[in-house]
C-alpha cells in the first residue's frame, strides 16, 4: 500500500439491506453516490455507508440498496409543485408559467381565453392550454366529478346540447388556429403547445329548459391525458447498449409508447427528457436544454431498466418498480423537479468523468468488492454510529395522488408505515408522494425511507491512494481494528477534492 501520492478522507453512513414489506412487495434501503478522481489529487472528503445484516428486526437478507441521503431528498421532494396543486382548477392568469406534463395524469388547465359570444352572449368559449409541448394524447375531460367528454365517446349525454364543441389541438400550429372573435383570432395558435377549445351554451334549448352550464364551465376541470414523449437511449443505436432509431437531438424520434409499452411514465426517462428539454421551432420551451454529449446516456439505460423491473406484490400480481406522473412548471426550481422524480425511483444524479448521469438502487453486493484495512486509513477518523434518537422517526405517513374517478387526481392518505420506537415514543415524519399514482407503490417507497432512517451512522477518515480505485456509490469492505470492523460492508456516499 502506498501513501506517497495522495490522501482521501472517507466518511461512512449506515444503511439497511433488503427487507420484505408485508402487503406491498419488496422494500429497499441503502446508499449510493457518485464521484470522479484524478491521479495525484488529494480528496478532502469521501463518505462510505455501512451495511449491517441483522442490525434491525426488519432486515432479513442482503439485497437492494438506494441513496443514503434519501431522507434529505425526501424532505426536499416533499415540496409539491404549484402546477401539480392547481391543475384541477381552471384559472385565467396571463403570467402563468409554461407547464410540462409527464406520464398519464391530469394535465395543466391554464385558461388562455374566456370569451362570451352570441347575440345575447348565450355562448361562452374557452381555450385551455394543457402543456407547453406536444403530448401523447388528451383522452378525457371532467367537470367537477362528472365526465363531460372522452376521445372515444365524444360529449357525454348529460352535457349534450350545452357542451357544444370540444376541439383538441396537439400541438397548435399556424395552420390549425381557432377563431373566436377579434379577441382571439385564428392567428392565436399557441404554437407548439397542446390545448383544448370548448364552447358551451349557457341558456336552455327551449323555453322551459335550463342549461346544465348556466355559468359556463365550472372552476374544477380535470383534463386527462398522456404527457411528454421521451427519448429512450435503449432505443438509440448510437449509444452503447442501445438499438433503434431514437436520437437525443431529434425529438421527432421520441415516443410515449414503444411497441405497445408505455415508456413515458418511466422516471429515469422523464428526468432525461427534462434535462434535454423540449423545443418549439428550434427554441427551448421547457426543460433544461442540456447537450446530449454532456450526459452519461448509458447510465440512463441502466436506470430505465431498473424502473421497468417487475415487483411481485404480496396481494398477488406484479407492478413496475417505479412509475411517475406529474405536472411541473418553469417556475419550479430545476432541482425540485429532479428531486421529486429521483426520490420516487430511489435515484441520484451522478457526475463522473465530466458527464452527468443517473444511478438507481439495485443489488450490487454480490460481486467482488474493493477492500480497505488499517493501512489505508492515514490519520484521525470520525465514527458516528447513529444520530440522536430524537432525530429519527418510527412512523411515516403522507399522501399520494389517486387517479381513480373517486378522487380524480387529488391527494389521499396512504396507510401509515411504522416500526417499534426504541424508547416507546412515537416520532412521525410526513412524506407526500405527489408524483406517485399507485397506493401500493407509495407504501413501498415510504417503507424504504423509514428503513433507511434507522441506519444513518457516519464514518470519516483520510484514506490513502488506493481509495482512488473506487467511486462514490461503490460498496466496499473495511477492516479496522480500532473499531473492531472485520470486512464490514460500506458504501461510498461522498467524495471531494
Where are the language model's segments positioned?
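Acidic, small/polar-enriched beta strand-loop surface segments
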Residues: 133-138, 146, 371-433
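An acidic/polar, Gly/Ser/Thr-rich interaction patch typically located in mid-to-C-terminal regions
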Residues: 302-353, 419-497
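Polar, S/T/G-rich
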Residues: 1-4, 8-15, 19, 25, ...
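Extended, well-folded interaction surfaces typified by the phenylalanyl-tRNA synthetase beta subunit core
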Residues: 356-357
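Membrane-helix interface motif
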Residues: 20-34
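Surface-exposed loop/edge segments in extracytoplasmic proteins
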Residues: 147-152, 366-368, 407-409, 486-487
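Flexible glycine-/small-residue-rich
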Residues: 360, 400-402, 494
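Hydrophobic alpha-helical transmembrane segments
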Residues: 45-59
Amino acid at each position: 500500500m502506498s501513501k506517497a501520492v495522495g490522501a482521501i478522507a472517507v466518511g461512512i453512513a449506515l444503511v439497511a439491506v433488503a427487507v420484505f414489506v408485508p402487503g406491498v412487495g419488496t422494500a429497499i434501503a441503502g446508499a449510493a453516490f457518485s464521484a470522479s478522481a484524478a491521479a495525484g489529487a488529494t480528496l478532502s472528503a469521501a463518505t462510505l455507508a455501512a451495511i449491517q445484516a441483522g442490525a434491525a428486526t426488519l432486515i432479513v437478507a442482503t439485497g437492494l440498496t438506494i441513496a443514503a441521503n434519501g431522507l434529505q431528498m425526501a424532505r426536499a421532494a416533499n415540496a409539491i409543485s404549484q402546477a401539480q396543486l392547481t391543475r384541477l382548477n381552471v384559472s385565467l392568469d396571463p403570467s402563468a408559467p409554461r407547464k410540462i406534463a409527464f406520464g398519464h395524469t391530469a394535465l395543466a388547465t391554464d385558461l388562455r381565453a374566456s370569451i362570451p359570444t352570441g347575440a345575447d352572449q348565450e355562448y361562452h368559449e374557452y381555450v385551455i392550454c394543457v402543456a407547453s409541448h406536444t403530448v401523447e394524447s388528451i383522452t378525457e375531460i371532467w367537470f367537477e366529478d362528472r365526465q363531460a367528454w372522452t376521445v372515444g365517446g365524444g360529449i357525454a349525454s348529460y352535457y349534450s346540447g350545452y357542451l357544444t364543441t370540444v376541439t383538441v389541438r396537439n400541438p397548435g400550429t399556424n395552420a390549425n388556429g381557432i377563431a373566436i372573435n377579434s379577441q382571439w383570432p385564428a392567428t392565436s395558435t399557441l404554437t407548439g403547445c397542446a390545448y383544448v377549445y370548448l364552447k358551451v351554451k349557457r341558456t336552455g334549448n327551449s323555453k322551459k329548459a335550463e342549461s346544465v352550464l348556466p355559468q359556463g364551465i365550472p372552476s374544477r376541470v380535470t383534463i386527462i391525458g398522456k404527457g411528454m414523449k421521451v427519448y429512450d437511449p435503449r432505443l438509440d443505436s448510437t449509444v452503447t447498449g442501445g438499438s433503434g432509431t431514437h436520437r437525443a437531438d431529434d425529438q421527432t424520434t421520441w415516443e410515449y409508447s414503444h411497441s405497445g409499452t408505455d415508456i413515458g411514465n418511466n422516471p429515469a426517462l422523464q428526468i432525461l427528457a427534462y434535462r434535454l428539454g423540449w423545443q418549439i421551432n428550434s427554441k427551448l420551451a421547457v426543460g433544461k436544454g442540456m447537450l446530449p454529449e454532456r450526459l452519461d446516456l448509458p447510465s440512463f439505460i441502466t436506470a430505465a431498466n431498473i424502473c421497468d423491473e417487475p415487483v411481485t406484490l404480496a396481494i398477488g400480481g406484479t407492478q413496475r418498480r417505479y412509475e411517475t406522473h406529474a405536472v411541473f412548471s418553469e417556475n419550479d426550481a430545476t432541482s425540485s423537479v429532479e428531486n421529486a422524480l429521483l426520490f420516487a425511483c430511489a435515484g441520484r444524479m451522478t457526475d463522473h468523468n465530466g458527464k452527468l448521469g443517473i444511478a438507481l438502487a439495485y443489488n450490487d453486493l454480490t460481486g467482488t468488492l474493493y477492500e480497505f484495512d488499517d493501512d489505508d486509513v492515514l490519520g484521525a477518523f470520525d465514527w458516528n454510529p447513529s444520530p440522536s434518537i430524537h432525530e429519527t422517526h418510527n412512523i411515516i405517513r403522507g399522501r399520494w395522488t389517486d387517479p381513480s374517478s373517486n378522487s380524480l387526481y387529488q391527494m389521499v392518505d396512504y396507510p401509515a408505515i411504522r416500526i417499534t420506537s426504541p424508547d416507546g415514543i412515537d416520532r412521525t415524519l410526513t412524506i407526500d408522494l405527489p408524483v406517485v399514482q399507485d397506493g401500493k407503490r407509495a407504501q413501498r417507497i415510504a417503507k424504504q425511507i423509514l428503513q433507511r432512517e434507522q441506519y444513518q451512522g457516519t464514518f470519516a477518515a483520510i484514506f490513502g491512494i488506493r481509495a482512488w480505485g473506487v467511486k462514490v456509490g461503490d460498496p466496499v469492505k473495511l477492516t479496522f481494528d480500532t473499531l473492531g470492523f472485520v470486512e464490514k460492508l460500506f458504501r461510498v456516499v461522498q467524495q471531494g477534492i
